[in-house]
C-alpha cells in the first residue's frame, strides 16, 4: 500500500509539472486597438474607453495605453464626469479569454443641487480621479467581446460590464 501511495504522488507531481509547462496564448500584437463601451452599478454610470497595444510581449502579456470617459450619478441630485488616461496589462489565457488590470488617473467634475432652506443651489467642483480595475474579456467573435470589471474610483461604478471592439 505504501508503494501505491508513492506511485500516486509521483504521478500527480508529473501531471502538475506537465501542466505547468503549458504555454499561454499569443498576446495581442503591437498596434492593436480596442474600443470599450459599458454600464456600471454602485453607483450607476456609463463608460467609454480606448486601449492601444504599445508592447506586445511584456511579462508574458501585453501592455496598452489609452483614455477613458466616465459618467455617473452617485446620488439623487448629483452627477460626475471624468476624463482619464489609462494603462492596462492584459494576459490572454485562451484565444477568446483575456484577463487584465487597469490603472487610471485624471480629472473629474462633480455637480450637484441642494436646498439651502429658501432655494435650490447648484454648485460644482473639480478634483483628481484615480482608480483601478481588474477585469476579463471574452471574445465570442474575432473582433467582438463582452467585458466585466471590478474596482473603480470615487463617485464612479465599482462593477461595470459592456462590449469591446478590437481592430
Place the predicted regions along the sequence by residue.
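Residues that define the transmembrane beta-barrel architecture of outer-membrane proteins
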Residues: 31-33, 42-46, 61-63, 77-83, ...
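Transmembrane beta-strand segments that form the barrel wall of outer-membrane beta-barrel proteins
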Residues: 29-41, 62-73, 105-107, 143-154
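Flexible, solvent-exposed loop segments that connect beta-strands
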Residues: 24-33, 67-83, 107-129
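Outer-membrane beta-barrel "beta-signal"
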Residues: 50, 155-167
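Short loop/turn motifs that connect adjacent beta-strands in outer-membrane beta-barrel proteins
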Residues: 23-32, 55-63, 77, 92-99, ...
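Cleavable N-terminal export/targeting peptides
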Residues: 1-28
Amino acid at each position: 500500500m505504501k508503494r501505491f501511495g508513492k506511485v500516486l504522488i509521483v504521478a500527480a507531481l508529473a501531471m502538475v509539472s506537465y501542466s505547468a509547462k503549458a504555454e499561454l496564448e499569443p498576446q495581442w500584437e503591437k498596434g492593436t486597438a480596442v474600443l470599450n463601451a459599458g454600464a456600471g452599478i454602485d453607483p450607476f454610470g456609463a463608460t467609454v474607453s480606448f486601449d492601444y497595444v504599445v508592447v506586445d510581449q511584456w511579462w508574458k502579456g501585453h501592455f496598452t495605453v489609452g483614455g477613458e470617459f466616465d459618467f455617473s450619478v452617485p446620488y439623487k441630485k448629483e452627477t460626475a464626469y471624468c476624463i482619464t488616461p489609462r494603462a492596462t496589462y492584459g494576459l490572454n489565457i485562451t484565444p477568446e479569454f483575456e484577463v487584465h488590470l487597469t490603472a487610471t488617473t485624471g480629472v473629474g467634475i462633480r455637480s450637484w443641487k441642494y436646498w439651502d432652506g429658501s432655494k435650490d443651489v447648484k454648485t460644482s467642483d473639480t478634483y483628481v480621479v484615480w482608480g483601478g480595475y481588474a477585469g476579463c474579456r471574452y471574445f465570442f467573435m474575432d473582433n467582438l467581446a463582452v467585458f466585466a470589471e471590478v474596482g473603480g474610483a470615487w463617485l464612479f461604478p465599482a462593477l461595470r460590464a459592456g462590449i469591446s471592439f478590437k481592430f
